[in-house]
From Swiss-Prot:
Residues 19-219 are annotated as: Beta-lactamase-like. Its cofactor is Zn(2+). This is Anti-Pycsar protein Apyc1. Belongs to the anti-Pycsar protein Apyc1 family. It comes from Paenibacillus lemnae. It catalyses: 3',5'-cyclic CMP + H2O = CMP + H(+); 3',5'-cyclic UMP + H2O = UMP + H(+). Zn(2+) 1 binds at residues 65-66, 165, 219.
Length: 245
């Protein structure tokens, strides 16, 4: 079954033009929201989609451009729709997502006292594929981003790598292509500067051309147009466009 991808946003954390790097991944009957940043509510509004049209949400890590829209999602589902949306995430993210991120805005004595009061929390194993729907299988892969904070990239349907925010890991990319038949790579990209917590364009350009041809770039800065024609064999993912994966 062919998956489809629609990026709600393709921008980095400080982008003003492209919204936060959040995505809809869907098959015929199921829509998964991958990350739900500050701009997700407006991004959904712009493509005429409601929270009700989403079947589940998955979080890769707890920075605001990836989780900042969860407070609205939780309140909308609880107060307006009277249901809890399934929330997929690594076990290691459950406590910090509530205690360090959502509790301050969502907590209501006797009503909302934990993440489970507003979401159906479904911890996912790391390094083992799990079926999210009949057409979507995914595996969490721990990847490096911020020291001391967990971040998880995704391996979808045994062939599609979707990077969380991560520093360059060429060994992982080569291993996925060589040993696991990966043929689509959706990769975050810092267009310029040193890659202390992100993967840079210069680093991705060191990959062989046959791998570059598999790569779609996302999580980029607002000066993206300045880099057209300077990204080797790679391509930019475009906001709101629907892709067959």
């Amino acid at each position: 079954m062919t998956l489809k991808l629609q990026m709600l946003g393709t921008g980095g954390a400080f982008s003003r033009n492209y919204f936060n790097n959040n995505a809809l991944i869907f098959d015929e009957d199921f829509t998964l929201l991958v990350d739900c940043g500050v701009t997700a509510p407006m991004a959904l509004h712009q493509i005429d989609k409601s929270w009700e049209s989403i079947d589940a949400v998955l979080i890769t890590h707890t920075h605001a451009d990836h989780v900042g829209g969860l407070e609205e999602l939780a309140f909308q589902m609880k107060l307006k729709h009277n249901r809890k949306m399934p929330l997929y995430l690594a076990e290691s993210l459950v406590e910090p997502l509530w205690e360090n991120t959502l509790k301050g805005g969502l907590y209501q004595e006797g009503t909302i006292m934990s993440l489970d009061d507003v979401f159906t929390v479904i911890p996912l194993p790391v390094g083992k594929a799990a079926d999210i729907s009949p057409g979507i299988s995914l595996e969490l892969t721990h990847t490096r981003h911020i020291p001391g904070r967990d971040s998880y990239s995704l391996y979808l349907n045994g062939r599609i790598f979707y990077s969380a925010d991560m520093t360059f890991d060429p060994d992982l990319i080569h291993q996925l292509v060589r040993d696991r038949r990966c043929d689509v790579i959706l990769h975050e990209c810092q267009l310029e500067g040193a890659g202390h917590v992100h993967t840079t364009l210069d680093e991705l350009l060191t990959l062989p051309e046959e791998i570059q041809e598999m790569i779609y770039l996302m999580h980029y800065a607002d000066n993206k147009n300045d880099f057209e024609g300077r990204i080797g064999k790679m391509r930019f993912l475009e906001q709101q466009q629907v892709y067959d994966l």
